[in-house]
Amino acid sequence: MSSNAQVKTPLPPAPAPKKESNFLIDFLMGGVSAAVAKTAASPIERVKLLIQNQDEMLKQGTLDRKYAGILDCFKRTATQEGVISFWRGNTANVIRYFPTQALNFAFKDKIKAMFGFKKEEGYAKWFAGNLASGGAAGALSLLFVYSLDYARTRLAADSKSSKKGGARQFNGLIDVYKKTLKSDGVAGLYRGFLPSVVGIVVYRGLYFGMYDSLKPLLLTGSLEGSFLASFLLGWVVTTGASTCSYPLDTVRRRMMMTSGQAVKYDGAFDCLRKIVAAEGVGSLFKGCGANILRGVAGAGVISMYDQLQMILFGKKFK
């Protein structure tokens, strides 16, 4: 071998892609996915909120008469406000996704370390940890994004009523914040916060409780590993959990509707008691049918969008 020959130093391996950049791509694409799903389901979401809050709207004089059902609400809203009004409040709903996901990413490891038990350590311990972690994560996220959910609710339930000459109460997202802060302060933006957190815990408890109970009974034999069977079970469990926890959603939204009003509820229990006394238990479930339809529409859109992502990018973004 010649002394003049140079020994080539092997090149260092190319640096692995940064996790931060991977997170950013997933974060942005997940945002697009959420925006598509929420925007597609916005009409049924607004109908759900109008039906759910109609008794509060009647008391406030922002609705002239009750809705006879989902179709009647669709028809009257389209006639009185135009088709584009079905997307009223959707901007706040879409914006909500980004801080929620960022917070979940930032704190999920810490919360998991605090409450993340394995099923092998005991089902009761795992189940309690799951509820605690869900409640902690939900409360933390809600603390930052609850005002957007409040604004979305107020915009969606702000109808053009003949009682007030067709005038709306709010002229957009910023106007909701300005008027609420002026009349009620910061507390007005967080009315209904406590039942929202309780609702998250109740929903998660029902979801995991039903799923773990039904899965070993139904997903057996030829159905084990079946995507369709798993999807249907997930939909049934989600629908059941959301229906059972729906009264808490009604209570929190009815509390939201009182910000800016002279008469308010003295907390979640007072709200629940007065609704049942004046309107009956059935009033707590108004809009529940539309809520179930929204779940079907959202799942369908997400499934189609996931397939599109697989074709274009070879992966799904969440």
From Swiss-Prot:
Record the organism.
Answer: Saccharomyces cerevisiae (strain ATCC 204508 / S288c)
Q: Quote the record's activity regulation.
A: The matrix-open state (m-state) is inhibited by the membrane-permeable bongkrekic acid (BKA). The cytoplasmic-open state (c-state) is inhibited by the membrane-impermeable toxic inhibitor carboxyatractyloside (CATR).
Q: Give the recorded effect for residue 109 to K.
A: Loss of transport activity. Restored transport activity
Q: Does Transmembrane helix count among this protein's keywords?
A: yes
Name the GO cellular-component terms: membrane; mitochondrial inner membrane; mitochondrion; peroxisomal membrane
Membrane topology is: Multi-pass membrane protein
Q: What is this protein called?
A: ADP,ATP carrier protein 2
- State a single Pfam family of this protein: Mito_carr
* Location of the region described as Important for transport activity in the Swiss-Prot/TrEMBL record: 252-257
Description of its domains? The transmembrane helices are not perpendicular to the plane of the membrane, but cross the membrane at an angle. At least 2 of the odd-numbered transmembrane helices exhibit a sharp kink, due to the presence of a conserved proline residue.
Q: Which GO terms describe its molecular function?
A: ATP:ADP antiporter activity; ATPase-coupled transmembrane transporter activity; cardiolipin binding
**From which domain of life does this come?**
Eukaryota
Where does the UniProt entry say this protein principally localizes? mitochondrion
